[in-house]
């Protein structure tokens, strides 16, 4: 009963932080558009007009707003998931559809928090809770990266660097608290998760893989911290990608040169591998003998 109660609390925290992450993703996009405009680069003018009100010069005006009508949102509009359900996915003030972006982020992070708690690989006691808290912070950064990549096909440096720093804190804490990190295995994990894509990026000059995926691989390599889980994470990312892409190519909904957001695949594959990667690796080794 206590375990279920704590899992529910983790889910609630996931909903709240998922709501926060969704709001920050829109603000990051707005800042990127402003930066592109100032630098004289091409940018989506319609999107710039819609998102620029999110960046107010005065702190008291920097509040969440409806992206359709610009109305400043009140407390009852910001309750994770409940506000969206109560208005049936529409703005309370202009009745325009809000979409599924925010509730999906909230639900995804809530599910990730709950699953992480329920199948956490080490006994949660004492400093283990600190390690778990840092893990949850890394998931917030990761869900923001996933959402940004899905929506705009780019992994911003601010988010990849932030995720990498949190991952570094996590692996250092894991080294001292759990004491299961081998430095040589960690180095190989970094080569697998980032180095492989770095080589592909250089060979293709950015046509096959984006530099953002290479940078994301650094953070994921630190989180996984072993060559076995890194190998499985990369394997799962490509396997999931094939499952999603091949039907699209067969039905001609996707073309050979279609741009695919690979960041979410890396994130999902790594999340699964963090918890069950060692078991999957054992299965792969056993299967290779038959």
Give each language-model segment a name:
Residues 5-31:
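N-terminal signal-anchor transmembrane alpha helix
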Residues 10, 126-127, 131-240, 245, ...:
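Functional transmembrane core segments of multi-pass inner-membrane proteins
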Residues 17-22, 109, 113, 141, ...:
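Alpha-helical transmembrane segments of multipass membrane proteins
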Residues 111-125, 171-174:
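Juxtamembrane "helix exit" motif at the C-terminal ends of alpha-helical transmembrane segments
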Residues 214, 247-272:
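Interfacial loop-to-transmembrane junctions
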């Amino acid at each position: 009963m206590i375990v279920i109660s704590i899992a529910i609390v983790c889910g609630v925290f996931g909903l709240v932080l998922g709501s926060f992450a969704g709001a920050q993703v829109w603000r990051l996009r707005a800042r990127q558009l402003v930066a592109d405009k100032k630098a004289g680069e091409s940018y989506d003018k319609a999107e710039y007009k819609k998102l620029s009100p999110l960046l107010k010069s005065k702190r008291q005006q920097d509040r969440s707003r409806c992206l359709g009508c610009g109305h400043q949102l009140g407390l009852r509009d910001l309750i994770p998931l409940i506000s969206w359900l109560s208005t049936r996915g529409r703005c309370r003030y202009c009745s325009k559809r809000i979409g599924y972006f925010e509730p999906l982020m909230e639900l995804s992070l809530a599910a990730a928090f709950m699953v992480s708690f329920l199948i956490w690989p080490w006994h949660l006691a004492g400093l283990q809770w600190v390690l778990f808290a840092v893990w949850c912070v890394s998931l917030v950064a990761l869900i923001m990266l996933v959402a940004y990549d899905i929506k705009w096909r780019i992994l911003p440096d601010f988010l990849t660097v932030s995720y990498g720093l949190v991952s570094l804190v996590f692996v250092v804490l894991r080294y001292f608290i759990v004491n299961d990190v081998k430095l040589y295995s960690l180095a190989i994990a970094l080569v697998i998760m980032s180095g492989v894509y770095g080589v592909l990026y250089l060979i293709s000059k950015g046509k096959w893989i984006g530099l953002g995926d290479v940078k994301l691989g650094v953070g994921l390599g630190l989180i996984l911290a072993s060559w076995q889980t890194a190998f499985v994470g990369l394997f799962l990312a490509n396997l999931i990608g094939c499952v999603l892409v091949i039907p699209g190519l067969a039905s001609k909904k996707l073309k050979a040169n279609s741009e695919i957001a690979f960041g979410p695949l890396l994130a999902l594959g790594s999340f699964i591998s963090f918890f069950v990667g060692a078991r999957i690796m054992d299965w792969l080794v056993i299967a290779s003998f038959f």
